[in-house]
Each structure stands twice: as structure tokens, then as C-alpha cells.
A protein has these predicted regions:
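N-terminal, positively charged nucleic-acid-binding surface of large information/translation enzymes
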Residues: 2-3, 11, 22, 29-293, ...
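Long, charged, mostly alpha-helical binding arms that flank functional sites
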Residues: 40, 125, 133, 141, ...
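Structured ligand/cofactor/substrate-binding pocket environments in proteins
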Residues: 92-104, 120-121, 190-193, 210-211, ...
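Secondary-structure transition/capping motifs at alpha-helix termini
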Residues: 105-113, 134-144, 168, 172-177, ...
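Short Cys/His-rich metal-coordination motifs, predominantly Zn2+-binding knuckles/fingers
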Residues: 220, 310, 409-410, 480-482, ...
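Flexible, glycine/threonine-enriched loop-and-boundary segments that flank and lead into catalytic domains
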Residues: 232, 236-266, 270-271, 460-462, ...
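Glycine-rich (often Gly-Gly/Gly-Pro-rich) flexible segments and glycine-rich loop motifs
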Residues: 476, 481-526, 635-662
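C-terminal low-complexity, glycine/proline- and small-hydrophobic-enriched intrinsically disordered tails
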Residues: 702, 809-909
Length: 909
């Protein structure tokens, strides 16, 4: 019964480490070889992967409550970073899903109750931009023509029509998410949480209003976050397309301008030459700065120069923090440059704004000839006017410069001084830093700890307001009483009534009495809610408080520390966060700050960060470069014409579209082959060994496709010979198998059998150790090597000789009987397919859920035992065996001889 015992042992091992169902339950399903896929002549991802997701969902396999012994099972919780509801699945999403799904399935394999929560982000700027462009294209109207509420209604219409697109694409990748907990960051529960959190922070004195320098998008007429700013390096003269201009705009050029000195010293310089890349901002110049270490300008501090355009005098000041000695000078424009603004603050200089929110020159009598002109029109006119005054000394290429561009609109960022709402971050940042330093939160890879510490110790207050219509409107109200007494207050509240009451409570007793008397005399109270909305990172930073709030009473506040502590572990709200390292500050750090402030415990105990995905040449993926790899095109296949049509449906300029389509034809002349989701997932897991950045190539996907094909053919080979292997679907009794294995007699195992089983156990050990340490590339590589080298290229080929009767006497002595090889194939595939199912999702899903057991063979006779003993002795005694056989094989053969001899001796008694 040795073959049956080994078969049951390995099946038991599979049940323990793999679990026959993805939800962590052991069961036996219909026979694999009766399914239609068995009739395929070759591997087809489209057919193999079809219908599995609906089958999984119908049986609730991703529901953490349906795991065996759910009430006592260890809990594992994880949040999927919410993709934008406006978007489609991009390769970064696919990487995140592949990693998180492998982690989720592995934890289910170990019997844990896995709660992997999905959702979508309302994508403030992105969503508003998409709907605005659609509105203008279809009706010729702007959002201002519709009005705020009507436009928001249009956004909701778009969301209801198109919002499920990315959800369906996520399912096509096989992500085993708990859709019962799905959220949208503008749904009522989340909106209430965001509102409550803001009011609490405001009342605690952590949110304030201030005028500071911000990154302003004139096209969007809103502040944008740093992650939405693309830094474009230039070397020399560079032409860049800018929205609203017919011709490209020139950048990377230094314009030289002469400023005459007022009352120059005898034998001293008569003027100071200044170089600037932004002559259009000269209208706001308030001073000329020089470096005190520059001998050329000694004695000029305290003097004045004449502004060549405005005919007014501006002072010369020393500022070594601002002026680079290599340049020697610099004009100060505080309203449109962060460094200049800091200089103005140090020296008490006036701030003169040049451009308004729309990017046009403001109404100012000092430069009336420029009022209403765009930045680029102003640049041309300034240069022309400087030439007329002979103050323009020409231009030269700047060696290097950086142009800041809005990633959402393509517009050039304009630094502007704007009143905004800010969150004080110093104390919360220190808490978040301490959590990592003390080990309460682990960062993987560990090198990110230094980056985390550096950013959190230097972080500035967070601008949380945006000048949009779509988003969480900021719950702050401007309360004003006008009459004989003027009262002007900002308060955070849930309604106008509450705002008025909170404003009254802020007044002193004397102010209240005076206000009461003036109210009788006709004082009017106006309460107006701020027009701005919150940064989307603020709302997404609160997600763990919503997703993992375990309060039994839904009316309990998600911000209550006692409520939050009812989660799976009082150490954190969830178990793991896996996301891209590019948003470690924008999302991960801010989420840690906000959630810990409210819950008094961190939002997660482990943060796993993956690198950015770039193209094969290491370039950032961009539609204009034609190097974007759409996961759905990789999964389903796409002809070149389809890839190019996708570009045409976007919002690229004519030049960008031309370049993009040309690059597509160059890189993918035959389009994309249909590789399937499993090949893509497996590739992305293997690519995570690239720790700095992932250089994505279709060659890697093609290799994984061949891996899936080889795996498929292995299953097909086994089941094509099901009759010879006597496969059936009896339930596996794990406990009895363990006992049987303790008494195993391996007389029928061969050298090759034992070698393969040894490598199987080695692979399983490597796989589980790697998964436990979140080294997914190592786990995937261990599986790949075992399948391709050990199982397919070696053992299966030997088994074919055995099945088809092509062995000579020596080979049969080494390989043993057909029964032995047949048993070991089934035993090895059983735990292996379950491991692969955790990594790929579908190609091994059916075998993983239906892997069968083999009927027991008949008892060996004494004659057969003696014959087997002689065969083993002849092999073990050969010179070649003693020279080349691995020690583990020799040790096993020695035990085998001893067991055979003992069995024969017992039989003779």
C-alpha cells in the first residue's frame, strides 16, 4: 500500500498548505477531465480563464465570513489602493492587484479569514476634467454655463454610466476581493467620515487658513498637489505645447536685461545686468538682489536701479541665500516665485501680483498696457518693449532648467500666492515617524525607512483645499455680522445653523451684548459655506477608518478610538498595506498621520512598497511616447490598429498623437498577442525583484505565457492518461494520511521519485518562506524553476518512457514500476497546483480545486519483494551510482534496502 500511502500523504500536504478551495475550505469538486477545457488541443487563455470569477463569487469564496471556523480564524485585512473612477486599469494597477492577490490567497491557504477591501476614488481633478471636456465636446458649454449643482449632477451621471468599467477590469485579473465591502469615496458613509474628521481637526486647532505660495494650474484654476506636477528637464531652447496657445511656447532661454543704477558711483558700474527665464513676471519686480561675495557689485547695496519697463526705482539688496554667485544677480518677483517670496519676507518687500487665477495680467494701473493678456502674450510684449528701450541685451540658452507642468491639464504651473486651508502636520508627522522607528509599523523594503524619516522630519503643513466643484466640499462657513459692529469669523460645522451657533459661542460676553444691541438696530448676519473642496488625498487618507471600522452599531463614530480598537488586532486597524513607493508620502504617510490621530493606533502594521513600472528602456510610460502597456491589451490581445485607435480617442495634441502612433508602430508592429491574465500576473510578480524600478517588456510576458502553457500541458498529459493512472475524486482524509505516512514503506519509490519529491518539498519550503517575508519574486521563481526544470523537463519525460513501455531493464530498476511514477505525478501535482493558483489565479484554479487521488494498488507478493530487493542492490552497488547519486538519494536507498530486508524477513516468519 506504499503508493496509496504516499499519494494520500501528498494530498494531505496539499490540503494543509494549499487548501483545495481558495476560501480556505477543503472539498472535492467535479472531475477536471470532464470539463470542456480538457478537449482543447492547445492552451487558450481566453477559454481557460473564462467563467472562473463568476464561479468563485457565486460560492462566496472571497467572503471572510465563509472561511471554515471563521469565528476563531486569524484575521488578515488589507486595503486595495482605490483607483480613480474615471480611469482604466493601467499597468501599475495590475502590479498592485497581482501582488495583493497573491498575498491574499496565500493567507487563505493558511486558513486565515481574509478581508481584502476594494473601492474607487472620486478623483476630484481627473473626474471634473473628463466631464468638462465631454460637456464642451457635446454641447459647447462650460461648467460655469451650467452652474455648480447642475454640473455635479452631470458628474454623477457619468459615474453611474462608466464607473463600473475599472471594476470589471479588476475582476478580469482574477483579484479575490471582498466585494461586499466595496466603497466609493463620495458615498454617504465616507462623506460623513470626511466631514466629521475635518471638523474635529479644525476644532482641535490643527486646520487653519493662510496665504502662501502654491502650485496653481491656470487651466484648472485650482491648486494642485506635488504629485500632479510633472517636472520636465530642459537643456537649452525647448518648445513645449501649452493649452490655449496655437504655437508652442519657448522655454530654457535666459533673457538678459539691463537695469540702470540711480546715482552711480564715480568709476563704478552704470548698470546691472540681470538674466531671467521669465521676462513676463518683470512687471512684479520689487527689488534687485546681489551676492555679497561678488566683487563686481561691491558698494551697490542700498542703492537703487530703474525698472526699464515701469520707470520706477527698486532697491538693490544683499541676499546670499537667493543669489547664486555664478549668476551674480537676480530680480525679485515675490508673487510668482517661492524663493523670491521667501526673500521678500526676509527683507520686508512689497508683493505685487502680475497674473490672476486665469493666468492673465491683473488690473493694475502701473502696467495698464498689459492688463488681460496671457502669460505668453505678456512675455512677447515685454521683450518687444524692452527692445524699444534698448534695455534688452539678447538671450542665450540655459544649460539646464526645469519646467513644471500640470499632469492633468498640460498647463504650465504658475506659482501664486493664494489663501488656502492648511493642516498642521508637525506633531502628527512625528507620531508617524516614531511608529516606524519603534517598529510598530514595518516598511518593506527597509531602505524606505530613511526616506520616511527624512520626509516626516522636514514635512511642511499640508494644503488641503482645492478650487474645484467635484469633491468633498469643505465644511467651513464664513459668518459675518454687519452693522454698528462688524464680526467676521470662520467656523467648521455641518450646517449653516450650526455654524451660526458655533460663531456665537466664539464671541466674548461683551461682544455678544454689543451684537445683541446692534442686531435690534438692523445688524445682518450672513453665513456662507466655502466654495472649495478637499484634496482627494485627505479623503483617501481616512479610508482605513471606514473600511476596518468594526463597530457593531453603525451610528457609532468611525473616529472613536474605542470603536477602532474593535478590529482584528488592537495593534493596528488592518494587517498590511501594499502600494507603489511613489505615493509613500502623498498617501501612506498622511494615512498614518490621520488614522493614528483619530484611532490612537496605526492604520496597518506592515507597509509593502513596490517600484514604479516603466517601459523596457526605463522610460516613464506616456501615451505621447506610444510606450503605454495596457493590461487589458496584454490579456485579450490587440492589433496595432486598435492600439492606435485608443490613442486617437484620448486628448493628445496633434503632434503628440503623431509621435505616439509612430512609436507604437515601431515597437509593436504586430500588436499584442493574447497572453491572458495569468501570464501577466506571473510576469509582474517575477519583475518585483527589480527593486528600483520595473522595466516592463512583453518578452517577459511571453516567457510567462510559455510557462502557463507548459503547466497546462502537464495537467493535460496527466488527465489524458487518467485511465492508466486510475484517477478518481475521493475525499482526502488528512488525519489518517498523516498516520499512514508515519509508517510508510517506500519500497516502490525510485531514485527519480525521491529526487522529485525532495525538490517539491524544497520548492514548498522556499515558496512559503518567501511569501512570509513578502519576497514574491523569490516565491514565483521557485515555482517556475520547479515546474519547468524538475517536473516538466525531467520527471514527465521519464514518466512518458514508463507509460509507453520504452524502458530497458536498467532504467526500470532506477525508475521502478509504472505504479510508482504514476503515483508520484499525482502526488507532486496536488500541492504544486495549489501554490501556482495563489500566484496566477486561473490556469491552475481548476486543477487546484479538483486535483484527484489514485486508487490503491494490490499488495506485493514475496517474490516481487525479493525481485525488487535485488534490483535496488544492483543499482546501489554500481560505480556510477556511488560516484554521482546525491547524498539524500543514497540515504533514502539505504533505508529502502533495510525496509525491504525487514519486510522479507518478516514474511518468511
Amino acid at each position: 500500500m506504499a503508493s496509496q500511502t504516499l499519494l494520500r500523504y501528498v494530498a494531505s500536504s496539499a490540503a494543509k498548505t494549499g487548501r483545495l478551495c481558495l476560501a480556505g475550505r477543503t472539498s472535492t469538486l467535479r472531475q477536471w477531465y470532464t470539463a470542456p477545457v480538457h478537449k482543447l488541443d492547445k492552451y487558450s487563455p481566453e477559454i481557460v480563464e473564462s467563467d472562473w470569477y463568476s464561479w468563485w463569487q457565486q460560492r462566496g469564496l472571497f467572503d471572510p465570513k465563509k472561511v471554515d471556523n471563521a469565528s476563531n480564524a486569524d484575521e488578515f485585512s488589507m486595503l486595495l489602493p482605490p483607483p480613480n473612477v474615471t480611469g482604466v486599469l493601467h499597468i501599475g494597477h495590475a502590479l498592485t492587484l497581482s501582488i495583493q492577490d497573491a498575498i491574499a490567497r496565500w493567507n487563505r491557504m493558511h486558513g486565515r479569514s481574509v478581508n481584502w477591501v476594494p473601492g474607487t476614488d472620486h478623483a476630484g481633478i481627473s473626474m471634473q476634467t473628463v466631464v468638462e471636456k465631454k460637456l464642451e465636446r457635446e454641447t459647447g458649454k462650460t461648467r460655469h454655463d451650467l452652474g455648480r449643482q447642475a454640473f455635479i449632477d452631470k458628474v454623477w451621471e457619468w459615474k453611474h454610466e462608466h464607473g463600473d468599467r475599472i471594476k470589471q477590469q479588476t475582476k478580469s485579473l482574477g483579484a479575490s476581493l471582498n466585494w461586499n465591502e466595496e466603497y466609493f469615496t463620495m458615498d454617504p458613509r465616507h462623506s460623513q467620515l470626511v466631514r466629521d474628521a475635518f471638523i474635529r481637526l479644525y476644532d482641535d486647532g490643527l486646520i487653519y487658513r493662510s496665504t502662501k505660495m502654491v502650485s496653481w494650474s491656470c487651466a484648472l484654476q485650482s491648486v494642485i498637489s506635488d504629485i500632479e506636477v510633472d517636472k520636465i528637464p530642459t537643456e537649452g531652447r525647448t518648445l513645449i505645447e501649452v493649452p490655449g496657445t496655437k504655437a508652442k511656447v519657448e522655454f530654457g532661454v535666459l533673457h538678459m536685461v539691463e537695469f540702470p543704477i540711480v546715482d552711480p558711483a564715480p568709476h563704478g558700474p552704470l548698470s546691472v545686468r540681470v538674466e531671467t527665464t521669465r521676462p513676463e513676471t518683470m512687471l512684479g519686480d520689487v527689488a534687485l538682489a546681489i551676492c555679497s561675495r561678488d566683487d563686481r557689485y561691491k558698494g551697490l547695496e542700498g542703492k537703487y536701479v530703474v525698472h526699464p519697463l515701469l520707470a520706477r526705482e527698486i532697491p538693490i539688496i544683499h541676499d546670499d541665500d537667493l543669489v547664486n554667485p555664478e549668476f551674480g544677480t537676480g530680480v525679485i518677483t515675490p508673487a510668482h516665485d517661492e524663493n523670491d517670496y521667501a526673500c521678500a519676507q526676509r527683507h520686508g518687500l512689497l508683493v505685487v501680483p502680475v497674473f490672476g487665477p486665469a493666468g492673465t495680467v491683473v488690473d493694475n494701473p502701473h502696467f495698464s498696457d498689459y492688463i488681460g493678456k496671457s502669460r505668453w502674450e505678456t512675455r512677447r510684449k515685454v521683450i518687444s518693449d524692452l527692445k524699444d528701450t534698448s534695455a534688452y541685451l539678447g538671450s542665450r540658452d540655459a544649460e539646464t532648467s526645469v519646467v513644471s507642468k500640470c499632469s492633468r491639464s498640460g498647463d504650465i504651473i504658475e506659482p501664486m500666492l493664494m489663501p488656502q486651508w492648511y493642516l498642521r502636520c508637525s506633531e502628527m508627522a512625528k507620531t508617524a515617524d516614531d511608529l516606524v522607528q519603534r517598529g510598530n509599523v514595518s516598511l518593506i523594503p527597509k531602505r524606505q525607512q530613511a526616506t520616511w524619516h527624512s520626509w516626516l522630519t522636514e514635512t511642511e503643513d499640508w494644503c488641503v483645499s482645492r478650487q474645484l466643484w467635484w469633491g468633498h466640499r469643505i465644511p467651513v462657513y464664513h459668518v459675518r455680522w454687519e452693522g454698528s459692529i462688524a464680526v467676521d469669523l470662520w467656523v467648521a460645522a455641518t450646517s449653516e445653523e450650526q455654524a451660526r451657533a458655533k460663531a456665537l459661542n466664539k464671541l466674548s460676553a461683551g461682544e455678544k451684548d454689543l451684537l445683541a444691541s446692534t442686531t435690534e438696530g438692523g445688524a445682518v448676519c450672513t453665513v456662507t459655506q466655502d466654495e472649495d473642496v478637499l484634496d482627494t488625498w485627505f479623503s483617501s487618507g481616512l479610508l482605513p477608518l471606514l473600511a476596518f471600522n468594526h463597530a457593531s452599531n453603525s451610528k457609532m463614530s468611525s473616529l472613536d478610538p474605542d470603536t477602532c480598537a474593535q478590529g482584528p488586532s488592537k495593534a493596528s486597524l488592518s494587517t498590511v498595506l501594499e502600494t507603489g513607493q511613489d505615493i509613500i508620502f502623498f498617501w501612506v504617510a498622511r494615512m498614518t498621520m490621520l488614522c493614528t490621530y483619530f484611532a490612537q493606533i496605526p492604520p496597518f502594521s506592515t507597509v509593502l512598497l513596490h517600484p514604479m513600472v516603466r517601459d523596457a528602456q526605463g522610460r516613464k510610460m506616456s501615451k505621447s511616447l506610444g510606450n503605454v502597456i495596457d493590461p487589458m491589451d496584454v490579456i485579450n490581445g490587440a492589433e496595432l490598429s486598435k492600439l492606435q485607435d485608443t490613442l486617437r480617442r484620448g486628448y493628445l495634441s496633434g503632434q503628440e498623437l503623431k509621435r505616439g502612433t509612430k512609436e507604437l508602430a515601431k515597437m509593436y508592429p504586430n500588436g499584442f498577442q493574447q497572453f491572458g491574465a495569468d501570464a501577466l500576473r506571473f510576469t509582474l510578480l517575477l519583475y518585483t525583484q527589480q527593486t528600483q524600478q520595473i522595466n516592463m517588456s512583453l518578452d517577459g510576458v511571453r516567457a510567462s505565457y510559455h510557462f502557463c502553457n507548459k503547466l497546462w500541458n502537464t495537467f493535460r498529459f496527466i488527465h489524458m492518461h487518467a485511465d492508466k493512472l486510475e484517477i478518481h475524486t475521493d475525499h482526502v482524509d488528512q488525519n489518517s494520511n498523516k498516520q499512514w505516512f508515519a509508517d510508510i514503506n517506500d519500497r516502490e519509490l525510485t531514485v527519480f521519485d525521491r529526487a522529485l519529491l525532495s525538490r517539491l518539498h524544497g520548492m514548498l519550503h522556499t515558496y512559503h518562506s518567501a511569501m512570509e517575508a513578502y519576497r514574491l519574486a523569490a516565491a514565483a521563481e521557485a515555482v517556475r524553476v520547479f515546474v519547468q526544470r524538475d517536473l516538466c523537463d525531467r520527471y514527465i519525460e521519464i514518466c512518458k518512457l514508463s507509460l509507453f513501455g520504452n524502458q530497458n531493464a536498467t532504467n526500470q530498476a532506477i525508475s521502478g514500476s509504472n505504479d510508482s511514477s504514476d503515483n508520484v505525478i499525482t502526488m507532486v501535482v496536488s500541492p504544486h497546483v495549489r501554490v501556482v493558483a495563489r500566484l496566477t489565479g486561473k490556469v491552475a484554479a481548476q486543477p487546484a480545486q479538483t486535483t484527484s487521488t489514485r486508487k490503491a494498488t494490490s499488495a506485493a507478493t514475496m517474490a516481487k519483494l525479493e525481485s525488487e530487493l535485488e534490483k535496488v542492490r544492483s543499482v546501489v552497488g554500481s560505480a556510477g551510482y556511488q560516484r554521482s547519486a546525491p547524498d539524500i538519494v543514497k540515504e533514502a536507498d539505504t533505508k529502502r534496502l533495510e525496509m525491504l530486508e525487514a519486510k522479507i524477513a518478516a514474511g518468511r516468519k
